[in-house]
Amino acid sequence: MSCQQNQQQCQPPPKCPAKSPAQCLPPASSSCAPSSGGCGPSSERSCCLSHHRCRRSHRCRCQSSNSCDRGSGQQGGSSSCGHSSAGCC
């Protein structure tokens, strides 16, 4: 085995690219429409967005108390959160 092959095997795996907001969004679905606050059918009471939780009002709320990026203009406790440095809030 050549030195070049050894070096290739010893290289660390590539870092994962930063997630874009598009990657964080769920697939298009009528139950995830913005008008429903991103929530699923009322019978399921599930939230289509990760790190969110649907409440009785069927609006998704961020579980995390961390605020989102200032550029999004949304805070962590709002019903429509932006993209935080740690992923989707």
Swiss-Prot record:
Skin-specific. Expression was readily detected in adult trunk skin, adult arm skin, fetal skin, penal skin, vulva, esophagus and tongue. Not expressed in the cervix, rectum, lung, colon, or placenta. This is Late cornified envelope protein 3A. A structural component of the cornified envelope of the stratum corneum involved in innate cutaneous host defense. Possesses defensin-like antimicrobial activity against a broad spectrum of Gram-positive and Gram-negative bacteria, both aerobic and anaerobic species. Upon inflammation, may regulate skin barrier repair by shaping cutaneous microbiota composition and immune response to bacterial antigens. It comes from the Eukaryota. Interacts with CYSRT1; the interaction is direct. Residues 1-10, 17-46 have a biased composition (Low complexity). Belongs to the LCE family. Transmembrane segments: none annotated. Keywords: Antimicrobial, Keratinization. Residues 1-46, 62-89 are annotated as: Disordered. The gene is LCE3A. One of its GO terms (biological process) is keratinization. Induction: Induced upon stimulation with inflammatory cytokines produced by T-helper 1 cells (IL1A, TNF, IFNG) and T-helper 17 cells (IL17A, IL22). Disulfide bonds: none annotated.
